[in-house]
């Protein structure tokens, strides 16, 4: 009886406490453009309660009834204070004004001290302003090149697409554009990304402690949010560069309610090169373009968004040879506020990646096309349950169509079809996560994602014999035909997530995290740098889902008079299962029996990341250093011993600095120093019928490392005096300032001056100093 009375007393106390609290909710927006502000901070004057806006600028905070003081702030914006007398739940939409230019601007977007207070670990957000400050190839600001300067991130060199995170392949990064995935984020074989920086709002990279709402890749999520469009006034901006130009127009359709944005880029390499081409190459083309469009509309508790992207790269050598590749995405989203504490987002997206290759002569022609298409619907919910609890939950279903090869050869005698059969899959997922802050010092996030992948007909399932020796090609044993919609294989995987934060002081904290990730899409490539026509394969009855368990812990510390310096040191260990590799001599192109050439093994990656940045003032930037190892072990390869991944770089040092000399001039520089990537060299050679054949010996893999990679880039920006509604600037940049000939690859060829002797040939993609000049403008 006594226990029941105590329980009733506790419940009554909780109810009385709840009755003395009210909710304040709404959106945080930029007053100059109407753009929503993600991760804005909302703080009660007592400091006992705080909240932040979500990806769509929505917030909800529970406060005591009566008079309260609330402060709203975000980087680069002026803090706004409210004195509210609250008797019931209230809606307060907040518009923050941009801070004056004289005030220091954050390099990487983040609230003061949020890196210490937040439970997030291994996560960085970069604003579009930061991206534009970093010196880049040919003076063009670039999203992916900026991401590659963050700790734990690397790539295999110039001319390579994508990026590598904590020992993962480029296919193990989920790259999202307004929530739609893109499968090749590069233009011009990796020199530029597909993201127009003028249309980008901000970019978030999550490497560890990955929340449960993200899934489908092992290593990271790169979430690129595009601008919604200015709903206050019309404006245009763009630039004229060395090899391409860009333009963006945005403005209100209905002021304060609806807006639009359109942005486009087009290179003119083919136009510039035409006068220097011989007559037989005058018709050649080499260009890329992209188009981004977006509209949004607000109505009461509802926000509607439609966005699209279309982009292509094309190379055509006088119609004798041609290759073309590109992405297309379309996204429709509906935000709905059910009540003050329940926010929802419903999304449908379409994404397609395709490439075409063609050869032709006077009497013959060959074409090859490949596609990966997915349609997806998902629902995400934020429930602001109590001042200390936030619960996220949702689900997603995605339908995939894989067209690995539509190949046709035509000549004077007829037509031959070498096309491969299509493949189909359905990926489903549900998730729930809770973030709990029981005290000011300690908070945690726990979540569970459950994913399912169905490999489906219409199509054939291939079954192979076990090889006589590990590492040998598997011979086909039988084929079974499945009808449309029939399930060939079904995989269900739980994916637990956990993260915590313990604040050791007002300016320091310890954080940790664990996440299991599952991946059902596999990029099959035998090159260190992915090429546009690599093969994407789904999980099948032969290819199992890739899995990774990652453990991360780190110490975060801010210091300086105004917390101007933020620092962190993190260490991680990642264990990977079902990593896909291939037998020696595998045929990866137009091979219907490709799965017989594939092997699976284990992987491991571990390392330490150090990060120091200065966020405000005339002098800003960051320094990061990463020591890491990424290895695999596959039976039948390298004598069944661990060997380095193709993208393993043990040491990576990045220095990014920006100094504002005056209102008109600023200088910036970045320095990169990295270990060389591994490659496979043969240990001997033998002669067959007069031909010299290399012998790797003991099926070695990645047994030699390329030389050190290092590079310095500099830029100077001159900002002209503003004229009414017109702003402009000139950017002079220098890529690879001291003319370093960094090796992209090393191969062997015959030295004709010493007959019969093979010599190592060092190949550099960019082996020279590259200057550039670009002009940027803005009208508003």
Question: Which stretches of residues belong to each language-model region?
Answer:
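Periplasmic N-terminal accessory/gating domains of Gram-negative outer-membrane beta-barrel systems
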Residues: 76-78, 109, 114-173, 177-210, ...
């Amino acid at each position: 009886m006594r226990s029941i009375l105590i329980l009733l007393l506790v419940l009554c106390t909780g109810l009385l406490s709840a009755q003395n609290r009210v909710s304040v909710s709404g959106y945080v927006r930029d007053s100059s453009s109407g753009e929503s502000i993600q991760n804005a901070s909302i703080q009660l004057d007592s400091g006992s309660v705080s909240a932040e806006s979500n990806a769509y600028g929505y917030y909800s905070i529970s406060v005591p009834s009566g008079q309260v003081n609330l402060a709203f702030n975000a980087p680069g914006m002026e803090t706004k204070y409210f004195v509210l007398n609250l008797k019931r739940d209230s809606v307060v939409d907040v518009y923050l004004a941009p801070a004056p230019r004289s005030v220091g601007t954050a390099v990487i977007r983040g609230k003061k001290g949020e890196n210490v207070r937040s439970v997030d670990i291994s996560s960085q957000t970069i604003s579009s302003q930061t991206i534009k400050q970093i010196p880049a190839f040919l003076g063009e600001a670039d999203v992916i090149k900026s991401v590659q300067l963050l700790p734990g991130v690397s790539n295999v060199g110039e001319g390579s697409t994508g990026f590598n995170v904590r020992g993962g392949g480029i296919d193990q990064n989920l790259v999202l554009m307004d929530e739609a995935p893109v499968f090749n984020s590069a233009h011009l074989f990796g020199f530029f990304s597909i993201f127009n920086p003028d249309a980008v709002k901000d970019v978030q990279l999550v490497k560890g402690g990955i929340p449960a709402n993200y899934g489908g890749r092992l290593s990271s999520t790169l979430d690129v949010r595009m601008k919604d469009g200015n709903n206050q006034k019309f404006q245009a901006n763009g630039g004229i560069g060395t090899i391409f130009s860009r333009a963006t127009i945005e403005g209100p359709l209905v002021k304060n309610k609806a807006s639009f944005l359109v942005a486009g880029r087009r290179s003119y390499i083919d136009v510039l090169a035409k006068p220097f081409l011989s007559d037989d190459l005058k018709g050649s083309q080499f260009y890329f373009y992209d188009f981004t469009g977006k509209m949004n509309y607000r109505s009461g508790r509802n926000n509607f968004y439609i966005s699209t992207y279309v982009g292509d790269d094309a190379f055509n050598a006088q119609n004798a040879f041609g290759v073309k590749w590109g992405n297309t995405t379309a996204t429709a989203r509906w935000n709905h506020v059910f009540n003050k504490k329940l926010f929802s987002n419903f999304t449908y997206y379409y994404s397609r990646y395709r490439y075409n290759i063609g050869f032709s002569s006077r009497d013959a022609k060959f074409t090859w096309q490949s596609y990966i298409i997915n349609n997806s619907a998902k629902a995400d919910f934020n429930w602001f349950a109590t001042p200390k609890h936030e619960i996220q939950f949702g689900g997603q279903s995605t339908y995939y169509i894989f067209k690995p090869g539509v190949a046709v050869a035509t000549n004077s005698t007829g037509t031959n079809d070498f096309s491969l059969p299509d493949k189909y899959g359905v990926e489903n997922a549900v998730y729930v996560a809770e973030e709990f802050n029981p005290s000011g010092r300690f908070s945690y996030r726990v979540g569970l994602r459950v994913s399912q992948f169905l490999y489906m007909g219409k199509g054939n399932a291939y079954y192979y014999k076990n090889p006589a020796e590990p590492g040998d090609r598997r011979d086909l044993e039988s084929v079974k035909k499945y009808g449309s919609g029939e399930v060939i294989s079904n995989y269900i995987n739980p994916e637990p997530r956990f993260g915590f934060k313990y604040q050791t002081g007002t300016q320091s904290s310890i954080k940790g995290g664990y996440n299991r990730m599952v991946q059902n899409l596999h990029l099959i490539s035998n090159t260190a740098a992915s090429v546009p026509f690599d093969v994407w394969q789904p999980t099948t009855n032969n290819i199992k889902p890739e899995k990774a368990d990652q453990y991360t812990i780190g110490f975060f510390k801010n210091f300086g008079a105004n917390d101007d310096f933020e620092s962190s040191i993190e260490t991680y260990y990642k264990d990977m299962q079902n990593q896909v590799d291939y037998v020696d001599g595998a045929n990866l192109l137009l091979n219907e029996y490709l799965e017989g050439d594939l092997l699976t093994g284990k992987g491991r990656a571990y390392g330490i990341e150090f990060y120091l940045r200065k966020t405000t003032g005339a002098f800003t930037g960051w320094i990061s250093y990463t020591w890491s190892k990424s290895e695999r072990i596959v039976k039948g390869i390298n004598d069944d011993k661990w060997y380095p991944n193709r993208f393993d770089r043990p040491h990576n040092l990045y220095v990014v600095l920006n100094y504002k000399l005056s209102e008109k001039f600023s200088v910036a520089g970045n320095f990169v120093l990295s270990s060389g990537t591994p490659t496979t060299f043969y240990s001997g050679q033998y002669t067959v019928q007069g031909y010299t054949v290399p012998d790797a010996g003991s099926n070695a893999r990645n047994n030699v490392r390329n030389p050190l990679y290092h590079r310095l880039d500099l830029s100077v920006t001159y900002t002209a005096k503003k004229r009414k509604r017109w702003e402009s600037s000139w950017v002079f940049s220098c890529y690879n300032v001291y003319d370093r000939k960094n090796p992209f690859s090393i191969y062997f060829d015959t030295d004709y001056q010493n007959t019969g002797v093979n010599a190592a040939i060092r190949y550099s993609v960019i082996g020279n100093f590259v200057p550039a000049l670009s002009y940027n403008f803005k009208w508003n």
